[in-house]
Amino acid sequence: MSSSQTPAFEVLTPLRNRVGESPLWSVAEQALWWVDIEGRMLYRHDVAANTTAQWPTAQRIGCIALHAEGGVLAAMETGLLHLLPGEQGQLSARPVAVAHHARPDMRFNDGRCDRAGRFWVSSMVLDMSLAAPFGALYRFDAQGLSAPRVSELIVGNGLAFSPRGDRLYLSDSHPTVQRIWHFDLHDDGSLSNRREFVDMNQHPGRPDGAAVDADGCYWICGNDAGVLLRFTPEGRLDRTLALPISKPSMCAFGGAALDQLFVTSITPARPAAGFDASLDGAVLMLRPGVCGLPEVACAATRAHT
């Protein structure tokens, strides 16, 4: 039986994002990274100092992952770049891999490293209203950026990995699809046995960004419905958390004990009824009563350009 709750929350920073995405907790830094895709901004919040650094970028950043040499691996419009903040507040950008999208009007969207340090990233056509199935899922590892591992996505999203690293989750958050799948993920990075995990047409919200907790349960942001949904590994809904924002975009576990859940959000074109418009675009912090897993840094550090 699923339980619905309205959790207590904190607002991480007064900053508001146009399209806040890709929250990423760094255990080594005890800091939260995230991006504003349309604001073209990279952020890092130092929890101990309660300060937020920000760096503007020339291109949209779809998502980020920790980089083994410090900073982050960023999936940008033209490809993957290693972004490394300097001592004087500048941001160095080193190209790592070139994007080969199916069309020129595309960008990377959602991404995350698996337990072996391979970076997985999806793509999408910029104009969602076209419902164009040219998006794909790629893998970046020591051999470079792969050919598409999954094709015919409209808005690839919801990437997450089981605690043992043997299952990959992927969703398509477009309103005409709204489904989550899981795959068997093998030691060599190959995928097999695609099957439906959850039909989100049966639940509130579109399946946006996701995370997996230490129990192996899958947390997904219900965009447009203002909820966080937790599914067991068998695909059963067991918790619903009601949020004060209508468009939660992605969640990530963090904090010293990995018992906090950070949630980024999107500022809607028009305020949604029943929600607190002053929090649109905010980054929230909840304590869901379960712990997450540390994020793995991308192990592939050599450029493939």
What are the residue ranges of the model-derived segments?
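Residue position within the beta-strands of beta-propeller blades
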Residues: 33-35, 74, 120-123, 169-170, ...
